Regions:
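Structural signal for hydrophobic packing residues in well-ordered secondary-structure cores
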Residues: 27, 31-34, 38, 73, ...
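Glycine- and acidic
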Residues: 9-13, 17, 75-80, 188-191
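Active-site beta->alpha loop and helix N-cap motifs at the rims of alpha/beta catalytic domains
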Residues: 1-37, 49, 53-60
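Short, small-residue-rich loop/turn micro-motifs
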Residues: 4, 73, 183
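Glycine-rich phosphate/ribose-binding loops and adjacent secondary-structure elements
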Residues: 21, 37-39, 44-162
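Alpha-helical packing segments of well-folded alpha/beta enzyme cores
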Residues: 19, 23-26, 30, 65, ...
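C-terminal extensions of enzymes
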Residues: 7-8, 165-215
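Generic recognition of stable, solvent-exposed alpha-helical segments in well-folded globular domains
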Residues: 18, 25, 90, 114, ...
């Protein structure tokens, strides 16, 4: 990703405008440097570069920033910055409207299931977030029926998988009771096993979304 300035929803509109322009200036410099380095690396694997669109909750700033990034020779776009949950789908739509169809749209920092659906419906292609691993460390387990805390008392003697029907490594080999025990003891294996399940959940979710679109 090209260098950008991540603002917060607490920054003023005036600051957000300055930030959009600053990010655009940095983006142009990044493209120039990327082209120079690509020429130097002739014959080596190509390294893609994405530009990042900022603008907080302001539709006009998001559209302006998207048009600016679209005007540069990026391989794709990153939809970044702080966004209120209620307009996350709208924000994706504002930005994707300005993007060429052949450029991938990556939404940064999204891991809520409903947010993923909102973004996909409005043009988002790929996603990243630390939440599956961060939540796993605290005992939060994602399932098709919602998220639950494995460290609650009812799971202490539950010898079933973290999620019925899940074919991840953790669910095929370990029980809720065992993962609960490891997390309570703060054993690193507990963090790892819970993370494996959560990451598998999101990979499978996106696989199913992709299959639904292709179908």
């Amino acid at each position: 990703f090209a260098f950008d300035e991540l603002t917060t929803l607490m920054n003023t509109r005036s600051y957000q405008e300055d930030s959009v322009e600053r990010t655009f200036r940095w983006a142009r410099r990044c493209v120039d440097e990327h082209q120079r380095l690509t020429a130097e690396r002739l014959g080596k694997p190509y390294q893609a570069l994405y530009g990042v669109v900022q603008g907080a909750n302001y539709e006009d700033l998001r559209r302006r920033a998207a048009s600016q990034i679209a005007s540069l020779d990026f391989d794709g776009v990153g939809i970044g910055g702080a966004i209120e949950k209620r307009i996350i789908g709208d924000t994706c739509a504002w930005i994707c409207d300005a993007m060429p169809e052949n450029r991938p749209r990556h939404v940064l920092g999204i891991a809520s299931v409903d947010d993923i659906f909102a973004c996909v419906e409005n043009g988002g292609d790929t996603f990243d977030c630390v939440a599956p691993a961060r939540c796993a460390r605290n005992g939060a387990i994602y399932t098709r029926s919602g998220r639950y805390n494995i460290k609650r008392a009812q799971h202490k003697f539950d010898f079933g998988p973290l999620e019925e029907g899940c074919d991840c490594y953790t669910c095929r080999h370990y029980s809720r009771a065992y993962v609960d025990h490891l997390l309570r003891a703060r054993e690193f294996n507990g963090f790892t096993l819970a993370t494996i399940h959560n990451e598998h959940f999101f990979v499978k979710l996106l696989d199913d979304i992709r299959a639904s679109i292709d179908g």
